[in-house]
A protein has these predicted regions:
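N-terminal periplasmic "start-of-domain" segments of outer-membrane beta-barrel proteins
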Residues: 114-124
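Glycine-centered tight beta-turn/hairpin loop motif at sheet-sheet or coil-to-beta transitions
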Residues: 26-30
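Flexible, glycine-rich terminal cap/loop adjacent to redox cofactors
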Residues: 107-108, 124-135, 140-241
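Conserved beta-strand segments of alpha/beta enzyme cores
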Residues: 2, 59, 148-151
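FAD-site-proximal beta/loop scaffold in flavoenzymes
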Residues: 32-108
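A conserved short coil-to-beta-strand element within the FAD-binding core of flavoproteins
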Residues: 5-18
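Internal hydrophobic alpha-helix adjacent to the cofactor/substrate pocket in enzyme cavities
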Residues: 82, 93-116, 144-149, 205-208
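Short beta-strand segments that buttress and anchor functional surface loops
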Residues: 21-24, 163-164
Length: 241
């Protein structure tokens, strides 16, 4: 399988039993590709028209999303917005978290703003995909800008006892961390990846180090052992060589 990213599709020509896609690569090269199936994703937009935003002086961006601050309040005092109406990840759990921040604010509390760079993402395909925090490329860029080093470890499910039992050994976990510092990102492809991300999300948000994670016991046989083994390997003492 080949995945092409950061390309710009210029045209799609229907040839009956196949289609021709003309696209431009990031380096400017124009390419023609024959394909059997074309799936087009147009993204999402908010339904913010005709709900009284302009009449109440509420600011929106060029795409129609409502502008809010860290407490989810708009530019108009007393009016808040959360979920798919604001320019944040369009995920149900993110909208829920935003509502919690808003409610705590209304109750007079001082909740921490959501760090959108670390929210958990899940893709319910097969095998499942999940991730939170930085990608490897983003971490490398961050390290270069801040004079830091990063370490990356990919641990497969192929030797995991639970994965073998359920017959789902394809996939891996990838941990990205600052050298001698906190975990920066967790990426999982494999069985129950969306369920396994919870531990990674906590570790990334609590800025746990790989040394912290490596000392924790993961029950056997479970898929979560792969997370622990990846952390142990990052300390320089890999279990499987």
């Amino acid at each position: 399988m080949e995945v092409l990213t950061s390309v710009s599709v210029e045209s799609i020509t229907n040839k009956g039993d196949y289609a021709i896609i003309d696209y431009v690569a990031p380096d400017g090269t124009k390419t023609e590709l024959d394909v059997n199936v074309v799936i087009i994703s147009v993204g999402r937009r908010p339904r913010s028209e005709n709900i009284g935003l302009a009449e109440n002086g509420i600011e929106i961006d060029e795409r129609g999303f409502v502008k809010v601050n860290g407490n989810m309040q708009t530019n108009v005092e007393g009016i808040y917005a959360v979920g798919d109406l604001v320019p944040t990840p369009a995920l149900a759990h993110v909208g829920f978290a935003e509502a919690m921040v808003m409610i705590k604010t209304l109750l007079g509390e001082n909740p921490a703003s959501i760090d959108y760079t670390k929210v958990p993402w899940g893709i319910y395909c097969h095998p499942e995909v999940s991730f939170c925090g930085m990608t490897e490329d983003a971490a490398k860029e961050w390290a270069a800008q801040n004079g830091k080093e990063i370490v990356v470890k990919k641990e497969g499910f192929i030797g995991d006892g639970r994965a073998i039992i359920i017959g789902e050994t394809d996939g891996f976990m990838k941990l990205i961390a600052e050298k001698d510092g906190p975990l920066l990102g967790v990426h999982i492809v494999g069985p129950w990846a969306t369920e396994l991300l919870g531990e990674g999300y906590l570790a990334v948000n609590w800025e746990a180090t790989v040394e912290d994670i490596a000392t924790l016991i993961h029950p056997h046989p479970t898929l979560s052992e792969v997370f622990g083994e990846a952390a142990i390997a990052m300390t320089g003492r890999p279990i499987h060589g």
